[in-house]
Amino acid sequence: MKKLLFLLAIAAMVVACQPKKKGYTLPDPHDVIMYEVNPLVFAQEGAFNVIASRLDSIRALHVNVMWFMPTYEQGVLKAKDSPYCIRDYKAVNAKYGTLDDFKRLVDLCHEKGMSVIMDWVANHTSWDHVWMADHPDWYTHDAEGNITWPAGTNWEDVADLNFDNADMRLAMIDAMKYWVNEVGIDGYRCDAADFVPFDFWKQAVDSMRAMPKRLLMLAEGKRADHFDAGFDMNYSWDYMNANRNVFQRDSSALILLQTDYMEYDTIPKGKVKLRFITNHDEAAGHSPVEEYGGVRGSIAAFVETIFLRGGALLYGSQEVAYPERLNFFHWKPVNWMSNPEVYNEYKTLLTLYNKYGALKWGQLVAYPAVDVMVFEKRYEKQDFLLLVNVRNHEVSTLIPQEWRGKKVKDMMRDTKKELPSREITLQPYEYFILKK
């Protein structure tokens, strides 16, 4: 008995002395701070290992979900080098690394407190996909019996899948389960979700929900029925487009409040829109620095977009104010050491966003204005007032009545101040995050 107790004591000491492995928790959709990873801005070859070396800088932004753009084997036949032209749903792209490299990267994300979701391209495959030869009936055919690309698009590098085929659906769901079981990922961002039938998404999401672990499911689309299919989040395309109209065409800031209301009025209570000022599609045409009137404009747009409500998305490169377009078909190195003051500003903003529940999902009280986004966020005893000048010139705006003359804390400058009795003046693209 004494020997047994001695051995148990030794075993307990060994366990206690081992370093604790940091865990992660899949965030609630309302708490998501997502980072979109385009491997080709990290390295031309071996991106998995290079991304691993950047995780601390990404995590310092309070990112809790890493979204990897397609990391699958790409097709060659009729291809245009798009990562969304997939040859094998169960194989990694060799130029990024090996399956073991990817597993290590996912494990490292988890150790640092970040969940991982992968891009899932359900709508189409490459023309030389492993299904093509053995299962031509899994694809859409035209009147002459030829396999076609997706209708209504110019995506001639990909072949359209036939969702009337039950076997194809099951094979796809099996492939989706593969990455959860084999690599331990935590969900999917489902590409071109508006192109895919509702009943397939319902079948697929139900199947994923039946797996032992909780998963995050994001639809790249704006159909209201995505939530009926079981998705947690979908895209806030309308808000982004309204934002561009405000910054590029001097539209009234009122349209941002109107668009926010319309987006949330059409989805079930408790569901979440993913908010962003850029992503790989948008940055392929223009960088956010170009789209929003410069670095200061891009940050102002980010502030009113993220703090209004919804999940938050950063596109890798945004945090260093990369000034050029990024064609995601090709390697384009980003200097991660550039513009450290911009990185630090994003870090401060997201630290506040992560720390205060009111700033993420507090009650929204909006004060309509033409040139300034003015809104309050309340939760329990937290009360914040945000003012964002959406113009590249000085603007004065009315202060909400109950904030006039109040002593507040300027959260970005870490100073205390007394607000004026009626109006406040903001410099071009200036913003304030004020706490009572």
Residue positions per predicted region:
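Short, solvent-exposed turn/loop segments enriched in Gly/Ser/Thr/Pro and often Arg
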Residues: 67-79, 119-128, 191-197, 220-224, ...
